[in-house]
């Protein structure tokens, strides 16, 4: 009998916790108008930011393609933007 009582109590507490969690989630979730406003404020909406992101992706892809085509460890370069073997020796570490 006490086991049944404990199980019912645990079930009631879990149900109450789930109810409180659901209520809090409903309170903090933005409405449809706020969602639309947030989407308009996204950085990708601005052409300059879009172009900058596209350029960054192009540079990353070019670096990955170069790294795949060479045996050099491009991560050790002092200037990643420069091509060729400009590692400089030592990878920028000093004793």
UniProtKB/Swiss-Prot annotation:
Localization, UniProt: Mitochondrion inner membrane
Chain segments carrying region Mediates lipid-binding: 23-80
Domain of life: Eukaryota
Alphabetical GO biological process terms: ATP biosynthetic process; cristae formation; mitochondrial electron transport, ubiquinol to cytochrome c; mitochondrial respiratory chain complex III assembly
Listed GO MF terms: cardiolipin binding; phosphatidic acid binding
Membrane spanning residue stretches: 8-28
Post-translational modification: Probably cleaved by OMA1 under mitochondrial stress conditions.
Mitochondrial matrix side: 1-7
The keyword Mitochondrion appears for this protein: yes
GO-annotated cellular components: cytosol; mitochondrial inner membrane; nucleoplasm
Keywords, comma-separated and alphabetical: ATP synthesis, Membrane, Mitochondrion, Mitochondrion inner membrane, Transmembrane, Transmembrane helix
Cited PANTHER family: UBIQUINOL-CYTOCHROME-C REDUCTASE COMPLEX ASSEMBLY FACTOR 3
Subunit structure, as described in the record: Associates with the ubiquinol-cytochrome c reductase complex (mitochondrial respiratory chain complex III(CIII) or cytochrome b-c1 complex). Interacts with UQCC1. Forms a complex, named COMC, composed of UQCC1, UQCC2; UQCC3 and UQCC4; mediates MT-CYB hemylation and association with the first nuclear-encoded complex III subunit UQCRQ.
Protein name: Ubiquinol-cytochrome-c reductase complex assembly factor 3
Organism: Bos taurus (Bovine)
């Amino acid at each position: 009998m006490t086991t049944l009582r404990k199980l019912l109590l645990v079930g009631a507490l879990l149900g109450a916790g789930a109810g409180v969690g659901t209520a809090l989630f409903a309170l903090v979730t933005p409405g449809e108008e706020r969602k639309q406003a947030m989407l308009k404020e996204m950085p990708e909406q601005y052409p300059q930011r879009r172009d900058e992101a596209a350029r960054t992706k192009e540079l990353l892809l070019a670096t990955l393609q170069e790294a795949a085509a060479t045996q050099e460890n491009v991560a050790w370069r002092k200037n990643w933007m420069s091509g060729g073997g400009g590692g400089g020796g030592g990878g920028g570490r000093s004793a």
